[in-house]
Amino acid sequence: QKTSRTTKKGNAMKLNEIREEEDKSSTPLILLDSPKNEPKPRLIGLFGNLDEEKTEEIVHSLFILDGLDHEEILEDPQDLTSAVKETIYKPIDFHISTWGGCARGMFAIYDAMRALQQRTDIITYGLGKVMSAGVLLLAAGTKGKRKIGKNCRIMLHSVRADQWGPIHNLENEMEETKLLQEQHINALVAETHMTKAHLKKLLDRKV
């Protein structure tokens, strides 16, 4: 018995045409994008070591997200040509799981976060491990919106340097390292309830 065509008169259809109709009516099992009526995630992450490339990526992502998906409140909601009374910026989620890395890169991201927090919240999440340069970034989240996983480990140590060259270069680098250390402590004091004396005591443990 042949099955390549239907047998009813006037309603003959090839099987490949039937399959085509079935394909058109089928529903995809995997959604590659959020439904249009759901908010898009405003998410960035720092995973692994913080180097120059990741610093650039995170800073650019912060400013790009800041310029997207905000809501303008008009003085007269019924008049679309009226002046903007207020702009509401939606929060940014920052997931952190890092061994640490470059201190200067840390400060670049930190300064970007501080600039954006003048108008939007940045919610930080510590996951797995937050060490070295990652500690300040976790602490730099909007106060009251800094979160940490139950099994996340935190590690803080003094600024480290790897220097070589003529003695005057080494002296200059040492002064720069001391300055970075002082900046790091001052930033942590500003973002936490820890005092400078307590932080210096922690850093003197030579982790």
Regions found by a protein language model. Name each.
Residues R5-V207:
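Terminal-region recognition feature
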